[in-house]
Amino acid sequence: MSETANIGDSHIFDGASESELNSNQQERLEQIRSAVEISREAVKAVSITAIDLLKEIPAFMAGLDFETELVNPFAHIEAPIWEEETVPQEMMEAAYAYCELLTRKEAGNFYHSFKYLPDEQRKAMCAYYAFCRRADDIADGDYVDVFPGSEGAQDPEAKEYRESLELLTGDKSVLDAPTYRDKLAQLFFFRKKLSTAYNCHASTDPIFMALKDTVSRFNVPREHLDDLISGMEDDLYTNRYRTFDDLYKYCYRVASTVGLVCIEIYDYDDPMAVKYAESWGIFMQMTNILRDVAEDAGRNRVYLPLEDLERHGIKPSELSGDLANDKRWHAFSAEFIEKIETYHKRALKLLPLLNRKARYSPAAMMAFYGSILKKIKKRDGNIFHGQIKLSKVEKVTLAAAIYAKQRFFRL
């Protein structure tokens, strides 16, 4: 197979959004995305020998300042994949250390919930979090990913990938052309790195080196990680969602897939855990969306379903203003909160189905987001005045209560 999918049988669908594609078109779109691969020919001359690299890693590990520094231990390798058949243990340890440091610096509440997992699961969660964080940062423009040897947005493969998506969907980006092309190219090469986690190669990006070990240990399906990248790509084309079903599909990609990967790492036996993990992601993402309505509207993004807003007489343009005392908003937010609570209740059913040693992590995350939702509800949906978050005291108190419940009581 070539490194990008053959697009000769694609067709042009003028103006079709992804939600309007029929099943065959949708299947073709996913084939194009999932066919992104990296080949052995991508290896270029490495500027340092394996033995020299191994000599440097102990110094790198010893010199890390876990409070301020985040240093890629393999930044000096000028090739996208490791040329040896196996990755030396020292390199793998450095890759996991990098992911854990990134998680400690960026994850906040999430990292706290990871700390009490068994070591192998904690390391895996940090590797997966690092993957998710980088994908999100690329989509938001907060991070510029590097793929050695590529030409960025002008790279022939990246251009072929972009054109294949546009031919199939007819979608036009909501971003300016240079920004759109740059972000999509980065996500394309991010998919290439992901492919190394599931083939015989190993990326020289520490995140994907650790991720390769993680998905192998815990049998994580690639489709969940591909779906998350697809969700980030959706943000390049869509800044409005007509129906709740449209919003649900987006939430599934960027959040439910996270829950589905987490339960593979946490361990479960009952197949119902899969459905509850899906609801877990929907609950957390919908809470985020409601909390960030005003901020997103200021960036010309409205994730709330337009048909539901219209039913309450609310125009998208009003969301960037102040609806705190508006009865229309009170009615809409109460209805939206009720939906979120439904998914929250389903998500809580996941906890008894997980390995007991892993329950604290998801329980803490659910509790933090549940508390944020309660704050919004108590304020009659007023997300327009002040940032809604938990204080440090609230976090510590809540975490202690959840830990005690998981440690000393049966669910």
Regions found by a protein language model. Give the residues of each.
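Catalytic cores of Mg2+-dependent Asp-rich isoprenoid enzymes
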Residues: 2-285, 290, 294-411
